[in-house]
């Protein structure tokens, strides 16, 4: 039995070898025999002079260069993001601080009839100058609030601080214009030629500003602000722009003040004797 099994196993080996040899013969015959007219071989036909190793090396170079560029760019992005995140955090902190200061200013600015904890505290001329710059850039005019129904009504809630800021800004604009005109006149009078002359002028110069625009304060301040916004020079006419003539504004204002202060009898005596009185002015 053992011999039979060995012989049988040997026969199986022979049959396997013969089958494998037949398959190899078929492959060789298929490769050696010319393909049929419509058949396509399972390999790519490259043009003559084409080097596949060169193509592979280029592709590998591109992949390696692309990976290195991406890694360097990612590092650069990380380096850029880190310093960018720091100022962003600082800016957010500054915004929070500014918001808290603004809220505290608003709370302290509110009051009834000037009853505030600190008159020279958060509400100062510096804040009004900042608001003045904003007003000039936004092309807004100057004037009191129109909230009260009549002139005798008491201001309530935010009307008081609004009118106070409008008044301070209008007076500051008028004083600024007068100061500029006075500084120009002083420069044209002394005409410094060197630093020593300029230092002497600064030490000896004394400018006194008197703001007395009368009821035309809002018009004068608005005209000066529009001139500054439009880049026009500040002239003396802007200080009396509320009336048709500059000199006439001062004289008419003086006459109106004088007529209010003078009694009625003196005003009647100043009239010409030859001029007839109107019927409405006669006393009955």
From Swiss-Prot:
Keywords associated with the record: Host cytoplasm, Host Golgi apparatus, Host nucleus, Phosphoprotein, Virion, Virion tegument
Coiled-coil parts of chain: none
Annotated Gene Ontology cellular component terms: host cell Golgi apparatus; host cell nucleus; viral tegument
InterPro entries in the record: Herpes_UL49 (IPR006908)
Feature: compositional bias, Polar residues: 115-126
Main location: virion
Record note on modification: Highly phosphorylated in the host cell. Packaging is selective for underphosphorylated forms.
Tree of life domain: Viruses
Residue stretches of biased makeup (Basic residues): 94-108
Residue ranges, annotated region (Disordered): 1-126, 239-284
Record's compositionally biased regions (Basic and acidic residues): 74-83
Localisation: Virion tegument; Host cytoplasm; Host nucleus; Host Golgi apparatus
Subunit structure: Interacts with gE (via C-terminus); this interaction is necessary for the recruitment of VP22 to the Golgi and its packaging into virions. Interacts with gM (via C-terminus). Interacts with VP16; this interaction allows the formation of a tripartite complex composed of VP16, VP22 and UL41/VHS. Interacts with the capsid-binding protein UL16. Interacts with host CGAS.
Family: Belongs to the alphaherpesvirinae VP22 tegument protein family.
Protein's job: Tegument protein that plays different roles during the time course of infection. Participates in both the accumulation of viral mRNAs and viral protein translation at late time of infection. Modulates the RNase activity of the virion host shutoff protein UL41 probably to ensure necessary levels of key cellular mRNAs and proteins. Plays a role in microtubule reorganization that occurs after viral infection by stabilizing microtubule network.
Protein name: Tegument protein VP22
Lineage: Viruses, Duplodnaviria, Heunggongvirae, Peploviricota, Herviviricetes
């Amino acid at each position: 039995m053992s011999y039979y099994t060995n012989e049988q196993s040997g026969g199986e080996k022979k049959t396997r070898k013969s089958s494998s040899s037949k398959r190899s013969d078929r492959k060789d015959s298929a490769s050696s025999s010319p393909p049929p007219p419509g058949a396509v071989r399972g390999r790519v036909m490259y043009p003559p002079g084409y080097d596949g190793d060169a193509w592979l090396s280029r592709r590998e170079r591109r992949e390696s260069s692309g990976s290195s560029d991406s890694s360097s760019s990612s590092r650069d992005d990380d380096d850029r993001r880190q310093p960018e995140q720091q100022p962003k955090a600082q800016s957010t902190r500054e915004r929070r601080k500014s918001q808290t200061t603004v809220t505290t200013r608003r709370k302290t600015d509110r009051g009834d009839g000037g009853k505030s904890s600190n008159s020279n505290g958060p509400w100062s001329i510096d804040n009004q100058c900042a608001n003045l710059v904003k007003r000039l850039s936004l092309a807004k005019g100057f004037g009191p609030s129109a909230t009260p129904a009549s002139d005798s009504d008491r201001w309530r809630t935010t009307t008081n601080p609004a009118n106070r800021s409008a008044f301070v800004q209008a007076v500051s604009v008028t004083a600024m214009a007068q100061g500029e005109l006075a500084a120009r006149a002083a420069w044209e009078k002394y005409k410094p030629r060197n630093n020593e002359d300029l230092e002497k002028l600064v030490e000896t110069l004394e400018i006194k500003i008197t703001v007395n625009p009368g009821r035309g304060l809002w018009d004068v301040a608005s005209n000066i602000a529009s001139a500054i916004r439009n880049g026009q020079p500040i002239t003396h006419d802007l200080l009396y722009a509320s009336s048709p003539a500059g000199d006439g504004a001062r004289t008419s204002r003086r006459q109106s003040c004088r007529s209010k202060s003078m009694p009625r009898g003196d005003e009647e005596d100043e009239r010409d004797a030859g001029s007839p009185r109107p019927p409405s002015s006669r006393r009955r």
